[in-house]
A protein has these predicted regions:
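Ser/Thr/Asn(+Pro)-rich, low-complexity disordered segments
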Residues: 13, 37-438
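N-terminal export signals
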Residues: 2-6, 11-32
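Intrinsic-disorder/low-complexity regions
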Residues: 1-2, 75
Length: 438
């Protein structure tokens, strides 16, 4: 793919804007409103489901282990079956990868000493060698040298995704060097600088032109940025930044939830690390909000069945991904992007804890009935059963969200590990989170 066709998710969104499975939707809506918060590991599922999720996690880990440079920085993308020559890494993919290394060590996917040394090397490079501005990193870098790629931005969201992985590693590994480096990397970030005098955070900064005009001022994947900033012991954000961003709502066939006109991943990313189950702030229970968003997205896909006959109870899910024409932000409701019948596996994979039986059925259907959609690193980024198009690539962030949410569904491991960080707890406390009482 031409490098010029590679865009960030948020750039595309800015451009666009400038057993419940068998129930009728009316009953799905009622079910979503009444759903009880339970630990994912307590949700009953079969041994075959567990085996598939383990395979999903192992293959994703293979990507993060194999497709990383000597610096530990994970590639933005690679060919589905390896033997890839891309050298561009994404700091967001590295954040998912660091969390994946914690899963791999806990599950014995590789020897502990090998994994510990990989984590050490990754953090050393982040602290000593990777260019930064006030602690924030460039979105895309060369995986071997750390050099900025494509004149990309210093990214507040991608730095936050990286930091979530850094803090997960600090909590999981008892190695003193890992803990020290992780603390320093997080502590160096100057969160108020990214406010640039405003009430909400900028999406990024360019050395050539300064801060981006676009701001994190409306609900999306932004919660992790503000919570990390609020919890910072060195350069904290003021508490009022949590209430400064808007929380618009969508009402789809009677089910209302907080969302912008954004793809499904915006309801997933912060929740891969921050555990919102059974908690709420002054506005919402955001875990339940993501349950509703997933229920509605499934029904939205089913409503397109006449246009795209392959969409069914067993096969649905669209979120930002590659398409046959290049990377695109698409989904709904409301309808976003030039939908063409493609299926994006990480849409279901990233929502496993929110709508487990339905999402698991999608992954099983793809694995069993679309063999070209599976390879060395797991599921392709996207495919189109209507046209027969299969993406030759996988994306690190899409493998990453599926891996982390699969593990959260199985054991809650990433939630339980990350939330032991006192900074994560402090951030949620400053934002006003408290237990949700029935």
């Amino acid at each position: 793919m031409d490098n010029k066709a590679w865009f960030t998710r948020r750039e595309l969104l800015r451009a666009a804007a400038l057993g419940a499975a068998a129930l009728p939707f009316s009953q799905l809506t009622a079910w979503a409103r009444q759903r009880q918060f339970v630990e994912p590991a307590r949700v009953p599922y079969s041994g075959s489901d567990d085996a598939l999720l383990d395979e999903v996690e192992r293959t994703a880990f293979d990507f993060f282990w194999t497709e990383a440079g000597k610096t530990g920085q994970a590639k933005d993308r690679a060919l589905l079956n390896g033997n890839d020559t891309h050298t561009v890494a994404s700091i967001a993919a590295t954040g998912f990868g660091l969390s994946g290394l914690c899963i791999a060590e806990a599950r014995g996917y590789r020897k502990k000493d090998e994994i510990v040394e990989r984590v050490r090397g990754t953090l050393r490079f982040l602290w000593r060698d990777l260019p930064h501005e006030h602690g924030f990193y460039y979105h895309f870098i060369d995986m071997n040298t750390g050099a900025r790629q494509w004149k990309c931005e210093i990214s507040s969201i991608d730095t936050s995704l990286l930091l979530c992985g850094v803090l997960t590693a600090r909590q999981h590994f008892s190695d003193p060097e890992i803990q020290d480096l992780a603390t320093k990397i997080y502590g160096r970030v100057d969160w108020p600088w990214m406010l640039n005098g405003g009430k909400t955070l900028s999406m990024g900064w360019h050395p050539e032109s300064g801060f981006l005009n676009a701001r994190w001022n409306q609900y999306c994947e932004l919660m992790m940025i503000y919570l990390l900033g609020l919890g910072s012991p060195t350069h904290p954000l003021p508490a009022e930044t949590w209430t400064a961003w808007k929380r618009p709502t969508i009402n789809f066939q009677g089910l209302e939830y907080i969302s912008g006109n954004d793809p499904l991943f915006t309801h997933q990313y912060s929740q891969a690390w921050f555990d919102f189950r059974g908690k709420r702030d002054a506005y919402a229970n955001y875990f339940m909000n993501s349950v509703k968003a997933t229920v509605v997205h499934k029904q939205f896909c089913l409503s397109l069945h006449d246009e795209f006959p392959d969409y069914s109870e067993h096969l649905w899910g669209i979120t930002s991904s590659d398409s046959a024409k290049g990377y695109t932000a698409w989904g709904g409701p409301p309808r976003l992007g030039e939908l063409d019948g493609s299926v994006v596996p990480c849409a279901a994979g990233g929502s496993l804890p929110f709508l487990y039986p339905d999402c698991m059925e999608v992954l099983r259907t793809i694995k069993e009935h679309y063999p070209k959609a599976w390879g060395r690193y797991g599921f392709v980024d996207a495919f189109n059963p209507l046209t027969g198009w299969y993406n030759p690539d996988v994306l690190g962030i899409d493998l990453g969200i599926t891996m982390l949410m699969a593990e959260n569904q199985r054991t809650g491991f990433i939630w339980n590990t990350f939330m032991k960080n006192k900074e994560a707890q402090n951030g949620m406390n400053k934002a006003g989170f408290h237990p949700q009482h029935a």
